């Protein structure tokens, strides 16, 4: 009677765990293994736990799949997937020059973004930003541009070039500063103009008033 109870208990535990009985040759007891399909080239070990005299329950050990080598490697910061696959370094835009003030938008575009502005008779606008509001420029000189890139001693530079051999950058920093200063002098506040023109008008009106007085 006692072996039958142990057998019933083993079958109950086996059915609850989702295992089917599997007889072992040369063993008086009974064992159970999982219903999973056999994997080619892989061996499963069994851990035996004694359930009673003359009987044992076999529980299979699950073999974890091997992880690929690339999963454990961390990507270098600042690189995209395509650049990492091709082995290309990250692109960094070199700065051509340094502006003395960031309010000078033309200098910022030229030095940091390397964008050449479009010179129009009315104003100077950066390429692709037509709605940019910039102060009106003065009259452009129709004479030939001097070929010498060395600035004169009395010319105030608006930027400093990173490379000493960059003649185009040196010419830009020396040439456009005069245009900017000219446009700054040409554009005066409205209040200042009213003060300058208001005096003579008031004196003229006062003289005419005296002439019309009886």
Curated annotation (Swiss-Prot):
| One Gene Ontology term of the molecular function aspect | hormone activity
Q: Name one GO biological process term.
A: axon guidance
Pro-sequence residue ranges: 17-94, 118-214
Kindly list the residue ranges recorded as spanning the membrane.
none
Give me the ranges of the annotated region Disordered. 24-91, 183-214
Residue ranges under compositional bias (Basic and acidic residues)?
Answer: 185-198
Domain of life the protein comes from: Eukaryota
Residues in the signal sequence = 1-16
- Which Cys-Cys disulfides exist here? 97-111, 99-107
Q: Where is the composition biased (Polar residues)?
A: 25-35
> Region (Endothelin-like): which ranges?
159-173
Q: What is its main location?
A: secreted
Q: Where is this site: Cleavage?
A: 117-118
InterPro entries in UniProt: Endothelin, Endothelin_toxin_CS, Endothln-like_toxin
Q: Which GO terms describe its cellular component?
A: extracellular space
Provide the protein's localization: Secreted
* UniProt keyword list: Cleavage on pair of basic residues, Disulfide bond, Secreted, Signal, Vasoactive, Vasoconstrictor
What protein family does this chain belong to? Belongs to the endothelin/sarafotoxin family.
The name of this protein is: Endothelin-3
């Amino acid at each position: 009677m006692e072996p039958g109870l142990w057998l019933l208990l083993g079958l109950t535990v086996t059915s609850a765990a989702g295992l089917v009985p599997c007889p072992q040759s040369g063993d008086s007891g009974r064992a159970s293994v999982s219903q999973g399909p056999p994997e080619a080239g892989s061996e499963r070990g069994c851990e035996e736990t004694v359930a009673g005299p003359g009987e044992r329950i076999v529980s299979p050990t699950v073999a974890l799949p091997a992880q690929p080598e690339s999963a454990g490697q961390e990507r270098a910061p600042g690189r995209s997937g395509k650049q990492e696959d091709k082995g290309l370094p990250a692109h960094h835009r070199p700065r051509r020059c340094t502006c003395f003030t960031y309010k000078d938008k033309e200098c910022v575009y030229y030095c940091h973004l390397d964008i050449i502005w479009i010179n129009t008779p009315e104003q100077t606008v950066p390429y692709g930003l037509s709605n940019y509001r910039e102060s009106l420029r003065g009259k452009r000189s129709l004479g030939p541009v001097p070929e010498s890139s060395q600035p004169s001693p009395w010319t105030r530079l608006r930027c400093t070039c990173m490379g000493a051999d960059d003649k185009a950058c040196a010419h830009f920093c020396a040439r456009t500063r005069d245009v900017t200063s000219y446009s700054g002098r040409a554009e005066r506040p409205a209040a200042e103009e009213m003060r300058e023109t208001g005096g003579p008008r008031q004196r003229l009106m006062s003289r005419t008033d005296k002439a019309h007085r009886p």
